[in-house]
Amino acid sequence: MVPVASAPAVPPAEVIAAFCRKWRIVEFSLFGSILRGDFNLGSDVDILVDLAPDAPWSLYEWTEMIEELRELFGRDVDLVEKSGLRNPFRRHEILNNREILYAA
């Protein structure tokens, strides 16, 4: 369990849903230290997204998404695209220990 004093405020579900609709995200999950007991004031928020197949985002838009998420969570974020999880061990660990906040 993450101590309340060090846990970031997770935006309300409707804010996450609006963000996902805007960026054509079909699934939005948290993973990593935010869900474990080792989250601290210096931790970033690990976010896994699954984009719609026709989402045309370039590196520029990806950077915009990260900046918007930093504002929403009030701290640094590590944004990972589900299709980019190529290492089978890391993929297994993330997919089995995530918390889905939005699914279209």
Regions flagged by a language model, labelled:
Residues 33:
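N-terminal beta1-alpha1 ligand-phosphate binding loop
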Residues 1-27, 36-37, 41, 52-104:
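Catalytic core of pol beta-like nucleotidyltransferases
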Residues 30:
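Conserved histidines in hydrophobic membrane contexts and catalytic metal-binding motifs
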Residues 48-50:
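Short hydrophobic/aromatic beta-strand micro-patches
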